[in-house]
């Protein structure tokens, strides 16, 4: 089933926690944690049956995507009180399909090398809005913030294999440098409840 995620940036002074509480029917609506990059103030995640983007005077900007999973897995289904991370990215137009599939395959292999990724899903976007025409959503769950900011960010597989797709100085570069890296706390797993 298709999924919907929105990274919502609020007007200065807006109450993030109150806004999240008033969102309504969602799988996840949480304020982002410090350290996000173009990741908004709030992450909203729900099933595609309701892909309506919230409309409110408190909203300054939204990056969102409707997407279909192409792969994923679970090392810890039912994870509780962890950290959900969402990366919206755009593969450059004209990239050969075989290259895109290699990028997807190497991204999906990350949890086999980075043990702090507890649950994960990679998806292709079917409908996007915001700063870019997003093509992929890469979601992960961690037991704590240290798993994301430590082992995930510093693992050699990440830097030696996957990062070359994101680095304009590498010949394999295919991902637009403007991306949305966002994360928040959750009470109950979003990816594998």
Range-by-range predicted roles:
Residues 158-167, 171-172, 176:
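Outer-membrane beta-barrel domain signature
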Residues 1-157, 177-193:
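Short S/T/G/P-rich N-terminal loop/turn motif that feeds into the first structured element of a domain
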């Amino acid at each position: 089933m298709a999924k919907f995620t929105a990274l919502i940036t609020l007007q200065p002074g807006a109450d993030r926690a109150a806004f999240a509480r008033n969102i309504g029917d969602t799988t996840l609506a949480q304020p982002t944690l410090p350290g996000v990059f173009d990741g908004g103030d709030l992450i909203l995640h729900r099933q595609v049956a309701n892909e309506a983007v919230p409309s409110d005077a408190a909203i300054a900007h939204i990056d969102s995507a409707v997407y279909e999973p192409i792969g994923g897995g679970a090392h810890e289904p039912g994870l509780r009180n962890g950290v959900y991370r969402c990366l919206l990215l755009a593969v450059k137009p004209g990239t050969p399909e075989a290259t895109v599939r290699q990028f997807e395959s190497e991204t999906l292999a990350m949890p086999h090398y980075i043990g702090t990724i507890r649950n994960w899903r990679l998806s292709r976007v079917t409908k996007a809005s915001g700063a870019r025409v997003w093509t992929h959503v890469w979601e992960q769950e961690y037991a704590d913030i240290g798993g994301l900011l430590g082992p995930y960010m510093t693992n050699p597989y990440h830097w030696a294999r996957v990062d070359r797709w994101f680095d304009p100085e590498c010949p394999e570069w295919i991902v637009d440098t403007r991306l949305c890296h966002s994360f928040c706390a959750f009470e109950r797993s979003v990816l594998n409840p």
